[in-house]
């Protein structure tokens, strides 16, 4: 007889190899065809709402690995929340306006298209990009409302954004003023804080002398009767700002010194600078000197000094006063700061505080980075080309003390990678320290309070965002672009004032935009709204900062706190969102702008929690770079290894820091995936012939080890669900992996094989095991589904068509409409766990001893061994309680327990009996049945009799 055929060998259509790259697109197509997302919505209707609001990626270019990380994390959260019993929608969004798309239109069609044509072509281009990105996001296994995303360029969104502008204007936050803003010459526009990045740059660092003018006043400040000629010395890394100098700054508490130097410079023998900087400065200038007097900075306030280029051109023959400034430091330079209010925030604030009118601020730099033609000596030059000319002019005017090359971190445009300057322009602002008209705290105060009320994942994000809000300037709302939501104001031609009915007019304009998009504002004749007044007003040509676009989506998409706007997806989503999730750069970007708009509109943040993930780097910790050649595209990984591997990599990595990826790292992820898949295959194969309705064993009648396995599974499930709840995905993956490899593979399933394969197919022993395995399989698949979505769905289809097929509440078409599995509570769960934890420890000791004996050549497999265990009372009771089933737990042919006063002692010997050809145990009763001499007594009973007596394992 071929006894192998008498075994219950496992079988399943779930293949060992996932063949993910080839098979995943089929699942994506099936989810689309069967409308899985809509099925999830129907199954979740009426449950508590959970809202993850999607931070919109920009609609330009293919997705990169950072996009994949972001979307996969969001998908894990939404799926896990749905399976935890929430109604969690996922409405993807796209950011559509702004410079990058405008640049693409200029590249393709030139720079001189009419504005309406730029807008229509930009709109079409954005739609093309969205289609490309949407396809790639869906390929990652991300489920969402892909047919109805929110787009910031949707007419309704553009209209509601204008309404948001009207509301914050009405509240008193918006004003127009001259201020230095981040300015990119290539963009020809102001930039948001989030659009500025820092890179190293080499600039000339110069020490410049401003000659004394009123020597009598200077002498009195230092307590002297008189002083010789000389100069105060400043240090700057922006020579191009010297023509615009209008003041000097010193620190009120710093000691300043008058130094007599030799050889004497042309402007005189005295130099004025901070006392602490005298020694290093004289050394750098190649001068000797002695301090003749000192004074605190506050004594110098109001003293005036001649412009250093006065001797070079009459247009610079003016003086600059000293203003006090707490921001002056002694880290570098001379302790004296030159102030050009048009090109520095602190300079601007200081000069304005001392009464300088906007009209008196010198701003010779045009939007393209060139000086106005009328500027003496340097008119028409770009500021960067002017730098060496200015240095040379200072030298000829005998005002240059020193020039050096300095490498330093400097502001750059994140799009063009070119230097950015501060430039005073007339812009529209949201005031950080403005009190709203209806009373209450300022925007800065309410935003800081909102940060304190927000949950941060990881926790360090709170301090980072807090510092940014505490120190940020007013928000520059306006941009000088064409493809953007208009700041649809009518401005008086003479006074510059807004029309008195602006809020009302904005609503009328919004209604037009709702029907025709932002193009409706472009084509609007002012007379249609203003009548005869139209001659007095002009249309404001500024557009809103794109960060206002995305930053107001909590109102335009979620519907806002009061529901007045409704929101494009207000019915599915809710305000505030439970979670915003983006990369760490969004503390400066979307988190930031959303916080400010939320606080301006409603006095609160639009989110309850912020989750931040790090950037992706290679295996050596380097940023992804085409020049370095270390870029890993998500499309390539999906096409070669499968998106499932990307998903597992994301979930396995601690996203709170940098996420490392490389071919080697992905190979390790593939190995982890294979181990999980093999576990699933074993589980599915061993419940393939099981009917959950007609063959399940009541939980109270399960074998002891099966009850323990379920208690162990319940504990694992609670831990993993807790990790999901806290957005801790890498510990969740780790726990699932150890459960599969250690709790199941190396323990429970290892022990179970004998019972599953050798007992009668319909025996209570085998059905008990299958009952437990089915619960374990369902639990495991549902816990894995948010991460390993393709694999869980594949396995679920098989399970639903076999073991679960006859259930009255048979599983739905997809695992994603399920909730986490409800495991039975066991009254003796804690006692079982304590007992079997000790049994596993003893088993590990036995296995170690068995390995020693096997290595010595005394036995082959562990089944050739017979074990004697000498145990103290506590261990003896535990071991003896299993009776003959102990040998199955230890996977040996005999296990005998002996009472002993001492700690555990294990003796192992090779069996002297014959090996059963069916179960491979070495037993004394092999050969005793004349009809079946090749097999042991229990196999004879299992095949031809009542079956072996077995209740524990």
From Swiss-Prot:
Annotated localization: Cytoplasm
Cofactor note: Binds 1 zinc ion per subunit.
Motif window: 'HIGH' region: 57-67
Motif ('KMSKS' region): 623-627
GO biological process: isoleucyl-tRNA aminoacylation
InterPro entries referenced in this protein's UniProt entry, alphabetically: aa-tRNA-synth_I_CS, aa-tRNA-synth_Ia, Anticodon_Ile_BEm, Ile-tRNA-ligase, Ile-tRNA-ligase_type1, Ile-tRNA_ligase, M/V/L/I-tRNA-synth_anticd-bd, Rossmann-like_a/b/a_fold
Catalytic activity: tRNA(Ile) + L-isoleucine + ATP = L-isoleucyl-tRNA(Ile) + AMP + diphosphate
Residues engaged in binding ATP: 626
Gene3D superfamilies named among the record's database cross-references: 1.10.730.20, HUPs, Valyl/Leucyl/Isoleucyl-tRNA synthetase, editing domain
Keyword Ribosomal protein: no
Transmembrane parts of this sequence: none
Co-factor(s): Zn(2+)
Top-level enzyme category: ligase
Keywords of this entry: Aminoacyl-tRNA synthetase, ATP-binding, Cytoplasm, Ligase, Metal-binding, Nucleotide-binding, Protein biosynthesis, Zinc
PROSITE patterns found in the cross-reference section: AA_TRNA_LIGASE_I
Matches recorded under Pfam families: Anticodon_1 (PF08264), tRNA-synt_1 (PF00133), zf-FPG_IleRS (PF06827)
Binding sites annotated in the UniProt record for Zn(2+): 916, 919, 936, 939
UniProt EC number: 6.1.1.5
Gene Ontology CC annotations of this record: cytosol
Primary role: Catalyzes the attachment of isoleucine to tRNA(Ile). As IleRS can inadvertently accommodate and process structurally similar amino acids such as valine, to avoid such errors it has two additional distinct tRNA(Ile)-dependent editing activities. One activity is designated as 'pretransfer' editing and involves the hydrolysis of activated Val-AMP. The other activity is designated 'posttransfer' editing and involves deacylation of mischarged Val-tRNA(Ile).
Subunit record text: Monomer.
Written domain comment of the UniProt record: IleRS has two distinct active sites: one for aminoacylation and one for editing. The misactivated valine is translocated from the active site to the editing site, which sterically excludes the correctly activated isoleucine. The single editing site contains two valyl binding pockets, one specific for each substrate (Val-AMP or Val-tRNA(Ile)).
Family under the similarity heading: Belongs to the class-I aminoacyl-tRNA synthetase family. IleS type 1 subfamily.
Official protein name in the record: Isoleucine--tRNA ligase
Species this chain originates from: Bordetella pertussis (strain Tohama I / ATCC BAA-589 / NCTC 13251)
Phylogenetic lineage: Bacteria, Pseudomonadati, Pseudomonadota, Betaproteobacteria, Burkholderiales
Gene name of the encoded protein: ileS
